């Protein structure tokens, strides 16, 4: 289970929104191996009904808060949508 950073304000609606967002994020973390990941690791999938991360979603999730709330999972997500060849790394799949 992911332990998210604790966040509380004097605004009950903001506190509730944060808790709901973290719960949604946590529900979308699954084990996965693809791209340049060397073994199966937790990643953020594209959402309910998906079984894999998507390139655009991985970037947006990392930018929006994943990089702060779950940095290792966010890094795994980004690595899972990269490929490597003799010229270096490149984005695979959808953009």
Question: Where does each model-flagged region fall?
Answer:
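Low-complexity, Ser/Thr/Pro/Gly-enriched N-terminal "stalk/linker" regions
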Residues: 1-53, 72, 76
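Helix-terminus loop motifs that line ligand-binding clefts
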Residues: 36, 69-95
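N-terminal structural segment of carbohydrate-active enzymes
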Residues: 51-53, 61, 84
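Non-membrane alpha-helical segments in proteins
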Residues: 56-67
């Amino acid at each position: 289970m992911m332990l998210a950073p604790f966040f509380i304000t004097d605004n009950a609606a903001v506190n509730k929104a944060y808790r709901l967002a973290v719960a949604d994020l946590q529900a979308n973390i699954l084990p996965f191996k693809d791209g340049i990941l060397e073994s199966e690791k937790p990643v953020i999938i594209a959402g309910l009904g998906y079984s894999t991360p998507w390139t655009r979603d991985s970037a947006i999730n990392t930018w929006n808060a994943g990089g702060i709330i779950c940095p290792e999972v966010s890094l795994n997500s980004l690595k899972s949508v990269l490929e490597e060849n003799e010229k270096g790394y490149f984005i695979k799949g959808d953009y």
